[in-house]
């Protein structure tokens, strides 16, 4: 069961849905490192199976869809 919550609540091990440029639909990505939080943004290193890890940045308050937790 997926749930939406503010990006500030993300933690290591959470699996979120993200859009990728070469994909038509959202894919599951796992938060794999400590999250960098600033006054205006949240940055997380994500892992998608079969790809290199990448960093995704969201503005504070944006909602993300979490598929499952750690």
What spans do the regions from the language model cover?
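Intrinsically disordered, low-complexity, charged/polar segments
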Residues: 47-70
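Mixed-charge, Lys/Arg-rich low-complexity intrinsically disordered regions
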Residues: 1-12
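Short beta-strand-centered aromatic/proline hotspots
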Residues: 25-36
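Short, solvent-exposed secondary-structure boundary/capping segments
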Residues: 38-47
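Short amphipathic beta-strand/extended segments with alternating polar/hydrophobic composition
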Residues: 6, 29-30, 55-60
């Amino acid at each position: 069961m997926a749930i939406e919550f503010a990006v500030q609540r993300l933690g290591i091990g959470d699996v979120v849905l993200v859009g990728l440029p070469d994909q038509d639909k959202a894919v599951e990505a796992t938060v794999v490192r400590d999250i960098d939080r600033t006054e205006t943004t949240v940055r997380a290193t994500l892992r998608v199976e079969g790809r290199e890890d990448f960093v995704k940045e969201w503005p504070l308050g944006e909602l993300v869809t979490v598929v499952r937790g750690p």
